[in-house]
Amino acid sequence: GYAFKPPPRPDFGTSGRTIKLQANFFEMDIPKIDIYHYELDIKPEKCPRRVNREIVEHMVQHFKAQIFGDRKPVFDGRKNLYTAMPLPIGREKVELEVTLPGEGKDRIFKVSIKWVSCVSLQALHDALSGRLPSVPFETIQALDVVMRHLPSMRYTPVGRSFFTASEGCSNPLGGGREVWFGFHQSVRPSLWKMMLNIDVSATAFYKAQPVIEFVCEVLDFKSIEEQQKPLTDSQRVKFTKEIKGLKVEITHCGQMKRKYRVCNVTRRPASHQTFPLQQESGQTVECTVAQYFKDRHKLVLRYPHLPCLQVGQEQKHTYLPLEVCNIVAGQRCIKKLTDNQTSTMIRATARSAPDRQEEISKLMRSASFNTDPYVREFGIMVKDEMTDVTGRVLQPPSILYGGRNKAIATPVQGVWDMRNKQFHTGIEIKVWAIACFAPQRQCTEVHLKSFTEQLRKISRDAGMPIQGQPCFCKYAQGADSVGPMFRHLKNTYAGLQLVVVILPGKTPVYAEVKRVGDTVLGMATQCVQMKNVQRTTPQTLSNLCLKINVKLGGVNNILLPQGRPPVFQQPVIFLGADVTHPPAGDGKKPSIAAVVGSMDAHPNRYCATVRVQQHRQEIIQDLAAMVRELLIQFYKSTRFKPTRIIFYRDGVSEGQFQQVLHHELLAIREACIKLEKDYQPGITFIVVQKRHHTRLFCTDKNERVGKSGNIPAGTTVDTKITHPTEFDFYLCSHAGIQGTSRPSHYHVLWDDNRFSSDELQILTYQLCHTYVRCTRSVSIPAPAYYAHLVAFRARYHLVDKEHDSAEGSHTSGQSNGRDHQALAKAVQVHQDTLRTMYFA
């Protein structure tokens, strides 16, 4: 297909006051030499990278005299090998045999080497200085392999990061998991220079420990002695969910620590689990695992009442008693962390900006790339100081309120408040109900009465008067009572505007309230935690009002019209799009794509579209239909056809820019043409990324903001650490509260509207101030944030009462075999809800 090429950077931004920053990018000095690229083929294939690296290391040693001499080749763990001097093998394929001393017996591998190409670093210099149109990908890949070769041998690589268990101190998370600290490293092209991006990071790993201890952690036993009888069904299911897919090693064969992958946990204990055993006579008998271990390994099991692990391939019937297995070290946890684990993780890893800066500098000193023999072999030098870069702090927009005084708020450090201000368009609430799902003894009628009074007072002040007492206020229990109660409300009270639902902490009731309210009956619902009813604060009540007003069709505030950038001179629609994927380990659940579109000129109100699509599919499959719906809705709301479409796309990684742009830009165009054959609004396609490792720090201590010492809200960078030729920028639009702020990265993949840098940066920053759920600037533009909320809400709509709890299904991770149509129907929002911001 025809490749769309992202536009060149139009200019550099100049708006705002300048600020001196340091970025965690380290300049690389790269010689203008050629690098020699060889392809390796290792047989048997499918070895883990770690093993491949060992093979190559042995090969280089063993064939030093014949082939490698003093060269120090670097290897990517798969099939790419690079050298600084050509190998004396010409263009022919060379076949070698390499022996790895193994556990028990040696393993023999066949390796073939063949020359692929010369990678010119001169071409890279030309691209970075803008003399060549695009940066050659294979050069960056080669440099990346050089920089990673040594750390890959020393540490446990995960993606682009390296981890190692903390020396001396462990950071347990519970449930058999612990925190490992490490660092991210990637080679990035920037204007004039290659940069090494280095950041500290942390992730959850499984603790290397006996499986018996793992069981205790997962099932909350003080010790295994508490469990004298077989596991119950629910215990076994929970344990299976945690251990399935992990690697274990056996301890009962001396030095032969064979490793296996767990595919299941047996229903029967080791004393009863049988398998077909071939006897010497040739006939097979059924033998129990416990008996086999006694006869074969002279091992009397201590815990014959516990189940076995089924390992290897399902059909092979290999069973291991728990007590002879250990969890293999260095396995990253890809399953979702529990809430407790997540908060423990954040406590262990959140660092104020200055602390993080110091840690990164410390890391650079200990990594000491300039003494790395492989890096030196290729003549590369890395500066050990962070890169200085000049940023700009943009002016925040003024925020216009309504009511009598039409007050104007001016954000300071990304924050403003509603004191003495009224909603731009407040909704009068006449008919409303309360449904309390918290137990009456904990959340008493006195609590409810005082909560109602406080809420009404705050709502009056905010210009969204709740007139009169609720028409209905009853207690209820359990998710099953939601449907009948809501039906009764809808049928009994004409003109019912809102149901306030009080919840006792985490509960399946929430998912059911949203399923019934959003998709079945089309009723506006506002949930409140019991603790916020028992003791109210002006802050929580005010936040509730922000959400309620919007759900009922109100407008909380708008950008001051005369302060908006020129793009607003013609009708423009803002679209936000996101795809969310199910947590890892759920093979069957669908991905959810959401697209929202602005419905007024402020822009304040948004309309949502949502679809289920194939598991882990990154591209929005049904985008044309979704955009079409939004354009029609925009026309109905405003009586205008947008002349411009500004599309903020979240959740795309760099490797997918091309694919996503190609498919989705065409889809947006198709949506327009299908509405009217000559309808061709200008499209600007911007990818928003939060998941990257660029961190910015204030050079001047006096510029640091707040306890966490972060850069000020509005800090923008579009030089030195950004792309050499394309249109991208960093913008930190929010005030960092905890840890180190991540500036969001914006990459313009298409622009029919010919934005200047200033205009697009200011527009983006202003849109970060239009998020209705709080009176602060958020980290990404409101439309992108809303798309995320819509997809997140759809996850709740998919929760199946019969099978899942909202926290995750305890069936074997499938969407209970519901077919695509059923899932599609489940996320379809009710007609009456469609035009409201139900997701707020």
Curated annotation (Swiss-Prot):
EC assignment: 3.1.26.n2
Superkingdom of origin: Eukaryota
Record field: catalytic activity: Endonucleolytic cleavage to 5'-phosphomonoester
Ranges where the PAZ domain occurs: 210-329
Database matches in SUPFAM superfamilies: PAZ domain, Ribonuclease H-like
UniProtKB keywords: Cytoplasm, Endonuclease, Hydrolase, Hydroxylation, Metal-binding, Nuclease, Nucleus, Phosphoprotein, Repressor, Ribonucleoprotein, RNA-binding, RNA-mediated gene silencing, Transcription, Transcription regulation, Translation regulation, Ubl conjugation
Residue positions where Phosphoserine is found in the record: 368, 805, 809, 812, 815
GO CC, one annotated term: cytoplasm
GO terms, molecular function: endoribonuclease activity, cleaving siRNA-paired mRNA; metal ion binding; mRNA cap binding; RNA 7-methylguanosine cap binding; siRNA binding
Residue positions where 4-hydroxyproline is found in the record: 681
PTM notes: Hydroxylated. 4-hydroxylation appears to enhance protein stability but is not required for miRNA-binding or endonuclease activity. Ubiquitinated on surface-exposed lysines by a SCF-like E3 ubiquitin-protein ligase complex containing ZSWIM8 during target-directed microRNA degradation (TDMD), a process that mediates degradation of microRNAs (miRNAs). Ubiquitination by the SCF-like E3 ubiquitin-protein ligase complex containing ZSWIM8 leads to its subsequent degradation, thereby exposing miRNAs for degradation. ZSWIM8 recognizes and binds AGO2 when it is engaged with a TDMD target.
Gene3D superfamilies the UniProt entry points to: 3.40.50.2300, paz domain, Ribonuclease H-like superfamily/Ribonuclease H
GO terms, biological process: miRNA-mediated gene silencing by inhibition of translation; miRNA-mediated gene silencing by mRNA destabilization; negative regulation of translational initiation; positive regulation of nuclear-transcribed mRNA catabolic process, deadenylation-dependent decay; positive regulation of nuclear-transcribed mRNA poly(A) tail shortening; pre-miRNA processing; regulation of DNA-templated transcription; regulatory ncRNA-mediated gene silencing
EC main group: hydrolase
Location in or out of the cell: Cytoplasm, P-body; Nucleus
Residues at which a divalent metal cation binds: 578, 650, 788
Residue ranges of domain Piwi in the record: 498-799
Pfam families linked: ArgoL1, ArgoL2, ArgoMid, ArgoN, PAZ, Piwi
InterPro entries (UniProt xref): AGO2, ArgoL1, ArgoL2, Argonaute_Mid_dom, Argonaute_N, PAZ_dom, PAZ_dom_sf, Piwi
Family membership noted in the UniProt record: Belongs to the argonaute family. Ago subfamily.
Purpose of the protein: Required for RNA-mediated gene silencing (RNAi) by the RNA-induced silencing complex (RISC). The 'minimal RISC' appears to include AGO2 bound to a short guide RNA such as a microRNA (miRNA) or short interfering RNA (siRNA). These guide RNAs direct RISC to complementary mRNAs that are targets for RISC-mediated gene silencing. The precise mechanism of gene silencing depends on the degree of complementarity between the miRNA or siRNA and its target. Binding of RISC to a perfectly complementary mRNA generally results in silencing due to endonucleolytic cleavage of the mRNA specifically by AGO2.
Subunit structure and binding partners: Interacts with DICER1 through its Piwi domain and with TARBP2 during assembly of the RNA-induced silencing complex (RISC). Together, DICER1, AGO2 and TARBP2 constitute the trimeric RISC loading complex (RLC), or micro-RNA (miRNA) loading complex (miRLC). Within the RLC/miRLC, DICER1 and TARBP2 are required to process precursor miRNAs (pre-miRNAs) to mature miRNAs and then load them onto AGO2. AGO2 bound to the mature miRNA constitutes the minimal RISC and may subsequently dissociate from DICER1 and TARBP2. Note however that the term RISC has also been used to describe the trimeric RLC/miRLC.
Cited HAMAP family: AGO2 (MF_03031)
Protein name: Protein argonaute-2
Encoding gene, per UniProt annotation: AGO2
